[in-house]
Amino acid sequence: MESYLLDWANLLLRWLHVITAIAWVGSSFYFVFLDSSLTPPEDEDLKRQGVNGELWAVHGGGFYHPVKFNVAPPRLPGHLHWFYWESYSTWLSGFALLSVTYLWNARAYLVHPADPLMHPHMAIVAALAFLVVFWLLYDGICRVFGQRPRGDAIVGALVAVLVGLAAWLACRLFPGQAAFLLMGAMLATAMSANVFFWIIPGQRKVVKALQNGQPVDPVHGQRGKQRSVHNTYFTLPVLFAMLSNHYAWLYSHAHNWLVLVLMMLAGAAIRQFFVLRHGYKLGRRPHPWPYALAGVAVLIGVLAWLRPVSPSAVSASMPGAAVAPALPAVAVEGGAAGYAQLAPLLQQHCVICHGAALQQKGVRLDSPQQVQAHAAQIYQQVVQLRKMPFGNPGVLSDADRALVQRWYETGAQVAP
């Protein structure tokens, strides 16, 4: 019953997380587009009110005319819409989802079976520390360098280095799947913290000053704008990190930290293309095609790097998954292995979760035909990733895994 309820919690939280993330990313991307597409107002009355940019748009059969004030409007309306619950709801639902999956099952997801020194409680603390420590370091960088000359460039370079170091460390401490997801959660935490600690408080100070008839300090808008820009460049890397959990050949590579960094870099470059494209369409900037070209080139390079190779090369490069300590290589001597040798292993260790009564992940392994249909998944989970049997992967010896490997590499036959 506990497993059933956890599955429902996982489903509902994942659904909620996707819904709120769509709302947050959508509003964030819209305002980046809006800021990049504003043109000086033509109406003299708007200029006198302090408007420094406007946009005319048509959507859904209606015409829209948003304007942006240089600092603040002369007076505030009775109702002012705020954009923050999209961010808070996304982070809260994401952290809840992280808790019921990775933290609740820390032994299975956060602790590598070859690392006897990492206790599940230690892994949980380390995972949470990644979220907090990165925010503190990132925030410190922004505080120290953000308002200096060329501060944006300095902050960008330092944060890029910090993300690279975090990726390397995460892939050393945690299994690749957890490392990739934690990197996404780490950046998403910084994004939401930017909203909570800087963007919204700064806006509240501006509103309070206007209500009290006091002059508005433009630094609040400048800081909020800087953090908002950071958020837009974090977005695509975060989305990649979350989606990567479905593709084991990414996070199980021997140099998975570098794979992660390169894919995040590609995402940031592609996002830069779209950000600058709005200014190009207005004649303000040169065509940003170099950023798109750079992002696509990195993607093609990673694609070529991770291309499938011979089975022997795969087994040599993938079992360790670049985590510490490295897993022992699976010995493959012993010739071909038939289904008759494989079946007892499946019956003893796999059918309990993948049989007639229960089919985890929709996989059933209690017949030769089903086993053959899922041969590639069996090979990946048992030999390459060494994650199965789930929750107790150490129950299978290297000899058992070598048997599965020989069976798969000699054709995955199930005929007697």
Q: How would you name each of these model-derived features?
A:
Residues S28-A72:
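Membrane-interface amphipathic/juxtamembrane segments adjacent to transmembrane helices
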Residues W15-E44, M186-G202:
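Hydrophobic alpha-helical membrane-embedded segments
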Residues R148-A157, S252-N256, Y280-V296:
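Membrane-interfacial entry segments at the cytosolic side of transmembrane helices
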Residues S87-R107, A166-L181, F234-H253:
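Alpha-helical transmembrane segments and their membrane-interface junctions
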Residues L5, H65-F83, D217-G221:
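Cytosolic juxtamembrane amphipathic/interface segments immediately preceding
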Residues V132-G140, W198, A266-L276, I300-R307:
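Alpha-helical transmembrane segments
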Residues G61, R75, F95, Y102, ...:
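Aromatic- and Gly/Pro-enriched helix-to-coil junctions and flexible linker segments
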Residues L103-H220:
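Long, contiguous internal "core" modules enriched in hydrophobic/ aromatic residues
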